[in-house]
Amino acid sequence: MKSLLVSLVIFLTSGAKKCKEDGKEKIPSCIQQKIDQIKKEAKWNPPAEVHEYSYNGKRVFYFTSNCCDRYNEVYDENCNYVCAPSGGYSGKGDMKCPDFKDKAKEVRLVWKDER
């Protein structure tokens, strides 16, 4: 009976870990696809980075751009465009989330192009 209980506990807890990656939430597949697309291109200068943030109670992903005059774009977990908090000619992004700098909390660096 004890081994059955232990087996059941192991089974149930292993299912809870499938959404985690090294103790962190798994990268959504659409975000991974965006990263994979960048990997197919020549290395950017500066190198591409993807950061995970918590913004307005949502999990979002900040993609750096490959040039100073392009927007640094933020996408939600479903790859819906949220805003561009920085970049562009003005450096202030698209002005759709002017509070990003103050309200967004960085969770982690998800990926950096180390090629």
PLM features per residue range, with description:
Residues 2-4, 17-59, 64-115:
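N- and C-terminal low-complexity/disordered segments
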